[in-house]
C-alpha cells in the first residue's frame, strides 16, 4: 500500500500496530504502512509516508502522545499550529517535536473530536485512541486534502488515494454505474461516491468516528451564507469596511502559509488571484520570491506575457518555462495518478507546472479559490443576466432569444461562441437550479442517455445525477441566485475538480501547494459578503481588484479571464486523432457495454468533420476508457510512473 503512494511522501515512512485483539482497521491518510496485512488481528494499523516541510529531523509519523495512548497519521499543514502549541503548553502538555502534527494529538487530548474546529489549514488525518478503542478521521473544510475509505463487516480501510486501497489482497474492483453517470455529467466523480462500489470519499468539512464496528459521520463546518443583514459575524456597513477586512484576512492567510523549513515560491499565471498572492508574499519577504509560470507554443493558451509583467512589477525572481504538451505520453500518467476518471484537461498543464516548480522549491502558494469565492467565472455573469431575463414578460423573452439567435454569425470560427450562446438560451427555459446544470455539464441528461447502451441505461433507473448539484443549492436558499451558485461551486466544483486537480498534480511531484484564498477565515468573509461588492456591472472579483490594485498591473486588472487550458480541439484533429478510434472503438471498450458504439462513432465523426466541437466530451470518454485499461483490465496496478522529460 505504501509503494503506490511514495510520491506523496518520499522523505520518510513509518507505521504503528496495535496489539489489542478485535476489529481490524487498515488505513493511510498520509499513506499506508508497507508491512501491514489486512488479515492482522490488531486493533489498528496506521501507516505514513512523509514529505518533510516543518521540523525536518523529528517529524516522523505515526506520532503519539506522552504515554502512547493516542496515535496520529496526518497529511497536510496546520498553519496556526504555533499559536495552538503555546496554548497547549500553558495547559500542561509536553511536546517532543516542533511539528504541527503533534499539536493535533495534544489538541485531541484536550478537546476530543471538537479539536478539528480549532485547526486552520488543509488536512486529512486519523487518530487512534487506544483507551477508547476508537478511530477518529477528519478532512479539512474546503476539501484540499483527499480521504478515501471502505467499510466492511469487520474492518475500516482508508487512504489518501484510491489506488492504495486497491493494494489490499482481494480488494473488490466493481465499477459503480452511478459514478460513471456522475462523471459524464460533471467530468469528475463527486463525493461521497467513488468510481468503485463500496469505496467512498469523506466529504469536505466532515469528521467521522469508527467505534464498535460502527462509522458515524457528521459535518462540522458550514460557511455563513445567511443574509448579510442578519449576519452578526461580519457587521460591516460599507464597501470600505469589507475591503479592509478582506485585505487584513488574506494578508494574514498568506503570512501563516509562508511558515516552512524548506524553500517555497508561488505559481504566477498573470491572473488577478495568483498576482495578488505573489504580491502579498513579496511584501513580507526580504528577498525576491520565486515565482513560476509555464507557456505553450499555441498563443491562445499562453499567459506568459501577463505573468512576466506581474513579476516585473512585484520584483519576484521569476522562472518561466515553455513546454510542448506530449498528450500521448501524459494520458496514461494522468490515469494512474488521478485514481478515478478525471476529465478536466487543465490537469495536463498543472502537472507540467508542478514538475518544473518542484525543481526549485518544495512548497508553492497558489491563487486557487479566488474565482469561486469572489464570483470570477463568466458563468456567474450568465446567471446574473438570466435573472434579468426572468423579469421580462414571457412574450418579450421569446422574441429576444429568437432575435439573438438569428443574428448570430454562422462561420466555423464563431462555433464556440455560438455554442455558448445556445447553451445560455436553452438554460432560460428551465428553473434556475437546473439552468446552471445545462451551462456547466459536459454531457447533459439527454445526451448521456443517447450515448449509453440499452443495458447500461437500465442500471441507472431512478438515479438522477443532477441531484448532487441541486442538493448543494440548498445551502443558502435566502440569498440571490448568483451567490447561491458561487456557494454551490464552493461545495462541488472547487473540491471535486479544482482542488483534486491541484492536489494530485502537485503531490505527483512531491510538491506541497498552499492556497491562501482557501483559509476558512477568508471563505467565511466571502460567504457573508454582499454580491454587489463582488460583482459590479457584470464584472466579477471587483472587490479583489479594487482592494489590491496596488499589486496589480493595469493590464491584469482589465484583462479577460483566459483559464489554464490546452488545445483539445486541435489535438483531436491531429496527433490524438488515431487514439479516438484505437481506444474508444477498441473491442475492449465495446465489450464493456457502457456506450452504444454507433453513438460514439457519430460523436467522433461530427467533431472531425467540423460539425461540432465535441472535444470536452471526447476527452471525457478517452479518460474513462484509459482508466479502465489502467485499473480494471490489469491483474495488478503499476506502483509508479516515471516523470517525463519536459524541457
PLM regions and their residue ranges:
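Cysteine-centered catalytic environments shared across enzyme families
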Residues: 1-338, 350, 354, 549-550, ...
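ATP-dependent adenylate-handling active sites, centered on carboxylate activation for C-N bond formation
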Residues: 24-25, 87-90, 110, 130-156, ...
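Structural motif
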Residues: 39-40, 91-99, 114, 173-177, ...
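Glycine/proline-rich, flexible active-site/cofactor-binding loop segments
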Residues: 69, 453-487
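Short amphipathic alpha-helical segments and their helix-coil junctions
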Residues: 87-92, 166-167, 465-480, 527, ...
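PAPS-dependent sulfotransferase catalytic core
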Residues: 552-611
Amino acid at each position: 500500500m505504501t509503494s503506490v503512494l511514495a510520491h506523496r511522501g518520499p522523505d520518510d515512512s513509518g507505521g504503528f500496530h496495535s496489539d489489542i485483539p478485535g476489529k481490524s482497521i487498515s488505513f493511510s491518510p498520509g499513506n499506508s504502512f508497507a508491512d501491514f496485512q489486512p488479515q492482522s488481528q490488531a486493533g489498528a494499523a496506521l501507516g505514513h509516508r512523509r514529505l518533510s516541510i516543518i521540523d525536518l529531523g523529528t517529524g516522523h509519523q505515526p506520532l503519539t502522545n506522552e504515554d502512547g495512548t493516542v496515535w496520529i497519521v496526518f497529511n497536510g499543514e496546520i498553519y496556526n499550529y504555533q499559536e495552538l502549541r503555546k496554548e497547549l503548553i500553558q495547559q500542561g502538555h509536553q511536546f517532543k517535536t516542533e511539528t504541527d502534527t503533534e499539536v493535533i494529538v495534544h489538541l485531541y487530548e484536550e478537546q476530543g473530536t471538537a479539536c478539528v474546529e480549532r485547526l486552520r489549514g488543509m488536512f486529512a488525518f486519523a487518530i487512534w485512541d487506544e483507551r477508547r478503542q476508537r478511530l477518529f478521521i477528519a478532512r479539512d473544510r474546503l476539501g484540499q486534502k483527499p480521504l478515501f475509505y471502505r467499510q466492511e463487516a469487520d474492518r475500516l480501510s482508508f487512504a489518501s488515494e484510491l489506488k492504495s486501497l486497491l493494494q489490499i489482497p482481494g480488494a473488490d474492483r466493481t465499477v459503480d454505474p452511478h459514478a460513471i453517470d456522475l462523471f459524464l455529467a460533471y467530468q469528475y466523480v463527486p463525493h461521497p461516491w467513488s468510481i468503485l462500489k463500496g469505496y467512498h470519499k469523506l466529504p469536505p468539512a466532515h469528521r467521522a468516528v469508527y467505534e464498535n464496528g460502527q462509522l458515524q459521520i457528521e459535518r462540522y463546518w458550514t460557511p455563513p451564507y445567511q443574509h448579510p443583514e442578519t449576519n452578526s459575524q461580519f457587521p460591516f456597513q460599507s464597501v470600505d469596511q469589507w475591503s479592509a477586512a478582506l485585505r487584513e484576512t488574506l494578508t494574514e492567510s498568506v503570512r501563516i502559509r509562508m511558515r516552512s523549513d524548506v524553500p517555497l515560491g508561488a505559481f504566477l499565471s498573470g491572473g488577478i488571484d495568483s498576482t495578488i498572492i505573489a504580491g502579498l508574499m513579496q511584501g513580507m519577504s526580504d528577498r525576491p520570491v520565486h515565482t513560476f509560470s509555464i507557456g505553450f507554443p499555441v498563443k491562445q493558451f499562453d499567459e506568459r506575457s501577463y505573468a512576466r509583467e506581474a513579476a516585473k512589477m512585484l520584483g519576484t525572481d521569476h522562472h518561466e518555462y515553455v513546454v510542448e504538451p506530449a498528450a500521448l505520453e501524459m494520458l496514461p500518467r494522468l490515469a494512474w495518478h488521478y485514481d478515478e476518471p478525471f476529465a478536466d484537461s487543465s490537469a495536463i498543464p498543472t502537472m507540467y507546472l508542478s514538475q518544473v516548480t518542484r525543481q526549485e522549491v518544495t512548497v508553492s502558494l497558489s491563487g486557487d479559490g479566488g474565482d469561486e469565492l469572489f464570483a470570477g467565472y463568466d458563468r456567474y455573469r450568465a446567471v446574473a443576466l438570466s435573472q434579468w431575463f426572468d423579469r421580462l414578460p414571457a412574450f418579450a423573452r421569446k422574441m429576444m432569444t429568437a432575435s439573438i439567435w438569428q443574428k448570430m454569425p454562422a462561420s466555423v470560427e464563431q462555433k464556440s461562441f455560438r455554442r455558448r450562446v445556445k447553451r445560455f438560451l436553452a438554460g432560460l427555459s428551465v428553473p434556475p437550479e437546473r439552468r446552471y446544470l445545462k451551462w456547466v455539464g459536459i454531457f447533459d441528461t439527454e445526451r448521456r442517455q443517447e450515448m449509453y447502451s440499452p443495458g447500461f441505461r437500465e442500471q441507472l433507473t431512478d438515479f438522477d445525477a443532477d441531484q448532487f448539484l441541486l442538493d448543494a443549492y440548498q445551502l443558502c436558499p435566502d440569498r440571490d441566485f448568483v451567490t447561491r451558485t458561487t456557494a454551490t461551486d464552493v461545495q462541488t466544483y472547487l473540491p471535486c475538480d479544482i482542488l483534486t486537480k491541484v492536489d494530485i498534480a502537485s503531490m505527483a511531484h512531491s510538491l506541497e501547494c498552499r492556497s491562501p484564498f482557501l483559509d476558512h477565515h477568508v471563505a467565511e468573509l466571502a460567504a457573508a459578503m454582499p454580491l454587489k461588492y463582488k460583482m459590479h456591472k457584470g464584472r466579477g472579483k471587483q472587490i479583489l481588484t479594487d482592494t489590491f490594485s496596488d499589486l496589480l498591473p493595469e493590464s491584469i486588472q482589465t484583462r479577460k479571464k483566459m483559464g489554464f487550458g490546452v488545445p483539445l480541439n486541435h489535438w483531436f484533429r491531429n496527433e490524438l486523432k488515431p487514439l479516438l478510434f484505437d481506444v474508444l472503438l477498441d473491442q475492449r471498450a465495446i465489450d464493456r457495454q457502457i456506450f452504444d458504439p454507433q453513438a460514439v462513432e457519430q460523436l467522433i465523426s461530427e467533431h472531425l468533420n467540423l460539425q461540432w466541437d465535441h472535444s470536452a466530451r471526447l476527452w471525457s470518454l478517452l479518460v474513462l476508457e484509459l482508466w479502465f485499461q489502467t485499473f480494471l483490465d490489469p491483474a495488478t496496478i503499476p506502483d509508479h510512473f516515471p516523470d517525463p522529460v519536459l524541457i
